[in-house]
């Protein structure tokens, strides 16, 4: 064969020099040409054809100049001979890697520096000095910018193969890799050492979650305990307390040990990260809280303060989550069985009502004006029936609402339409159920051979929902029927806190489901004369293994709880199609005023108002209920059209009032409303208030009702002079308040006063109340309200449609106060029903209430 063929084949080994056709590298034609041209002085691929022929390659300057190794070292993602992309770890990559094993440049191989080429022989001419090697190392550039490959300059994916190879190669550079380096700015890059990645478990060879936080914390611990000042030239505590959210890690962990101080996710006491944080932050700050966390004990004054107000940390004054780590710690160390809360003690401050509350005694970020917490608490706030720690059973004996009914001046059990008569009935139900023994699985309604099957004479399912069912039951030894609602324990925390109930309505400490607590509060609100438009409950019990009858869902055996309540004749969806306009008007007014009483006392966000969740009782028609709004002195006269409507189902509620102590979200407060006149009616409803918009500097990001982070407040809200005018010149911010975060408002906001500082999220509940009658989209849940009611075009229906068509972004932002009808249920009632300002002639008063 002519030499020119070999030269041509050497220049372009991808084509046959005789035919000009493309040939496959490694194929039969390629191998034949390789053998044919291997006898001459010109070698095609000495490193590929003759393995290890370094001397021959060095002897041929022309071939050495055409070596692919320099280009391969610069860019290992492309074949230096063809220019085509190659897969890292593929056959071509491995062939080039073997061919360039003796190349003196940086190798693209992904191996640890400690194990890279242990038996490699390096030519003396190619040996580098330590200074040259340090200068050629990619580690300094990788430490400065870990998002780029220092050899190619291309962007690399954090955690990808190239990144991990460089991380392994530079493991000893600066003692820490860039992702966990103390000089990396976590706040600017958005990264955190408290991130988890999936790794292979060496023992099981299966994906197992490991916590890089523990490794990084262990490294920081070495620096914290090091005696050498030359090895570490920075303060590692400042690294731990880097600006990730408001405050440092140790400050946030000391303030709330129940949550990860960086991510905000719940943190268990058994979590290894909790142990590491305790070890690192045990000396910072040096406060009684950290002393108690590290096991140095709790003094008597601290226990006394905790027993007086178990909703606040007695050391820091901040809110404590019920059954959280701090709560359990103080409950275990403090015996509160012999300590009773004195009269006039406020739950918000833990001080006596007679002694003024100073600004220094208030917990940080409470946003309350001085003296706001010194007022006497409402009965439902001070009761704490289901939240008093340190006792073996939190509901032993009679609930607090039983003692509340006897204190009312108009307490009359002889009138079947009075709340007192209804309370006496549920009291008898509770007393009877406490004598009934539980079944094998506890107080169950649907388990095999369950409690109801053996004790009840009749059991009829009258309603089904997504998470439970409602039964109308009749017991052998009780004269009347009543309702039992079986609900599934949904939240993980409730399942974790679950403990069986041996006696009806007698719960172990910390095991009461949230809905049971809310129902007890609602019953107490009715018992204290605030509203008759809510259902009354008679206690609850737990079930180990129920088989609930759910709506459109396959039932599984799980843990449940049962609640007993007074019987109703039907839900609103059954009777609404046959209601007259006067009956529907009375029903809507009852629901709105019942909602207002809950907004005032609990700061409730119901989130599930619909016709199916409104219970209706038949009552003899005639008379009226007198309801007084204590905020503006407005008096409503609700005519009795033969139906008593009760707002029920509190399974997904949120209670944003801090004094209640059941939520970390305190709601959106965008203005202060101060009444300057008695409440007005019709189109003038709400204009009796002086409106002062609120601005804040910090925005708390809440998605899905959960805290995400904080950022500068840039959420703009435009205010109008009236509800029908155009947008004015007043521009403010959207102000979301969250427990423990100071959003820096421009005025003192009393979060417990939901009348002066209404919760903007209440617009959804008001809209759902009205849309239940006039139709429309559900505000708090997916779907639409089915139009059961047959509209007639009456005046109140047109006013209700105005409220129902509110804009969720702009409605309510009016300087004259007319937009309050979208937020406050009582103002909406005054706008829709101006005729209820006076009673009907000749009608008698059934009962009076003040909300």
From Swiss-Prot:
The keyword Kinase applies. SMART domains: S_TKc (SM00220). InterPro entries: 2-cysteine_adaptor (IPR014901), Kinase-like_dom_sf (IPR011009), Prot_kinase_dom (IPR000719), Protein_kinase_ATP_BS (IPR017441), Ser/Thr_kinase_AS (IPR008271). The keyword Acetylation does not apply. Residues 456-851 form the Protein kinase domain. Gene3D superfamilies: Transferase(Phosphotransferase) domain 1. Keywords: ATP-binding, Kinase, Nucleotide-binding, Serine/threonine-protein kinase, Transferase. Residues 125-141, 340-366 have a biased composition (Low complexity). SUPFAM superfamilies: Protein kinase-like (PK-like). Belongs to the protein kinase superfamily. Ser/Thr protein kinase family. This is Putative serine/threonine-protein kinase 019R.
């Amino acid at each position: 064969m002519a030499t020119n063929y070999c030269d041509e084949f050497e220049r372009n080994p991808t084509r046959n020099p005789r035919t000009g056709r493309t040939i496959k590298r490694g194929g039969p034609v390629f191998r034949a040409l390789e053998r044919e041209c291997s006898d001459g002085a010109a070698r095609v691929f000495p490193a590929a054809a003759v393995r290890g022929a370094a001397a021959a390659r060095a002897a041929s300057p022309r071939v050495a100049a055409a070596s692919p190794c320099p280009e391969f070292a610069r860019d290992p993602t492309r074949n230096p001979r063809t220019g085509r992309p190659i897969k890292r770890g593929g056959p071509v990559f491995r062939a080039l890697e073997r061919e360039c094993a003796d190349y003196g440049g940086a190798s693209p191989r992904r191996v640890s520096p400690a194990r890279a080429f242990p038996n490699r022989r390096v030519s003396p001419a190619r040996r580098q000095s330590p200074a040259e090697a340090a200068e050629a190392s990619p580690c300094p550039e990788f430490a400065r910018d870990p998002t780029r490959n220092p050899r190619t300059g291309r962007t690399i994916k954090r955690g990808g193969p190239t990144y991990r190879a460089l991380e392994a190669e530079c493991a000893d550079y600066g003692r820490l890799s860039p992702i966990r380096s103390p000089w990396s700015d976590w706040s600017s890059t958005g990264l955190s050492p408290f991130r988890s990645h999936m790794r292979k478990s060496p023992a099981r060879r299966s994906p197992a979650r490991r916590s890089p936080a523990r490794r990084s914390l262990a490294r920081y611990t070495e620096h914290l305990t090091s005696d050498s000042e030359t090895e570490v030239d920075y303060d590692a505590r400042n690294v731990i307390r880097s600006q990730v959210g408001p405050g440092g890690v140790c400050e946030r962990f000391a303030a709330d040990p129940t949550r990860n101080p960086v991510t905000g996710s719940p943190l268990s006491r058994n979590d290894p990260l909790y142990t590491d944080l305790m070890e690192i932050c045990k000396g910072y700050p040096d406060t009684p809280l950290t002393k108690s966390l590290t096991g140095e004990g709790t003094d008597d004054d601290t226990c006394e303060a905790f027993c007086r107000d178990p909703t606040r940390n007695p050391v820091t004054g901040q809110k404590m989550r019920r059954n959280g780590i701090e709560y359990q710690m103080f409950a275990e160390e403090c015996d509160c069985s012999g300590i009773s809360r004195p009269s006039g003690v406020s739950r918000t401050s833990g001080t006596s009502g007679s002694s003024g509350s100073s600004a220094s005694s208030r917990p940080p970020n409470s946003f309350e004006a001085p003296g706001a917490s010194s007022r006497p608490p409402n009965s439902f706030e001070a009761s704490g029936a289901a939240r008093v720690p340190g006792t073996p059973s939190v509901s032993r004996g009679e609930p607090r609402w039983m003692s509340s009914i006897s204190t009312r001046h108009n307490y009359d059990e002889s009138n079947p339409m009075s709340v007192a008569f209804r309370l006496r009935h549920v009291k008898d139900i509770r007393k009877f159920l406490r004598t009934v023994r539980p079944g094998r699985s506890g107080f169950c309604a649907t388990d095999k051979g369950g409690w109801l099957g053996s004790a009840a004479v009749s059991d009829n399912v009258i309603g089904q929902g997504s998470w439970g069912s409602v039964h109308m039951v009749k017991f052998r030894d009780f004269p009347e029927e009543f309702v039992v609602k079986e609900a599934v324990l949904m939240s993980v925390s409730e399942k974790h806190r679950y403990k069986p109930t041996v006696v009806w309505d007698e719960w172990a400490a910390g095991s009461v489901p949230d809905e049971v607590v809310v129902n007890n509060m609602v019953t107490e609100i009715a018992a204290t004369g605030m509203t008759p438009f809510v259902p009354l409950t008679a206690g609850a019990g737990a079930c180990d293994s129920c088989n609930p009858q759910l709506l459109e869902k396959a039932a599984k055996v799980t843990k449940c709880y049962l609640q007993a309540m007074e019987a109703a004749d039907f839900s609103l969806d059954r009777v609404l199609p046959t209601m007259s306009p006067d009956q529907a008007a009375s029903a809507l007014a009852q629901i709105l005023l019942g909602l207002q009483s809950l907004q005032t006392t609990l700061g409730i966000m119901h989130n599930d108002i619909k016709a199916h969740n409104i219970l209706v009782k038949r009552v003899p028609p005639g008379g009226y209920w007198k309801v007084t709004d204590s905020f503006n002195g407005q008096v409503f006269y609700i005519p009795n059209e033969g139906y008593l409507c009760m707002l029920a189902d509190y399974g997904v509620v949120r209670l944003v009032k801090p004094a209640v102590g059941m939520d970390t979200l305190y709601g959106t407060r965008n203005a202060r409303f101060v009444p300057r006149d008695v409440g007005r009616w019709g189109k003038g409803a709400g204009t009796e208030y002086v409106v002062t918009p609120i601005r804040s500097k910090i925005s708390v990001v809440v998605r899905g009702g959960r805290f995400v982070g904080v950022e500068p407040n840039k959420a703009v809200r435009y205010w109008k002079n009236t509800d029908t005018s155009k947008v004015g010149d007043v521009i403010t911010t959207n102000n979301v308040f969250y427990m423990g975060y100071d959003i820096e408002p421009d005025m003192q906001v009393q979060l417990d006063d939901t009348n002066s500082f209404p919760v903007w999220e209440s617009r959804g509940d008001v809209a759902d109340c009205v849309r239940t009658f006039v139709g429309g989209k559900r505000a708090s849940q997916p779907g639409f309200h089915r139009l059961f009611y047959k509209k007639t075009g009456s005046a109140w229906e047109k006013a209700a449609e105005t409220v129902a068509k509110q804009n969720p972004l702009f409605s309510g932002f009016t300087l004259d106060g007319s937009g309050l009808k979208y937020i406050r249920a009582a103002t909406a009632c005054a706008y829709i029903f101006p005729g209820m300002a006076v009673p009907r002639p000749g009608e008698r008063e059934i009962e009076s209430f003040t909300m």
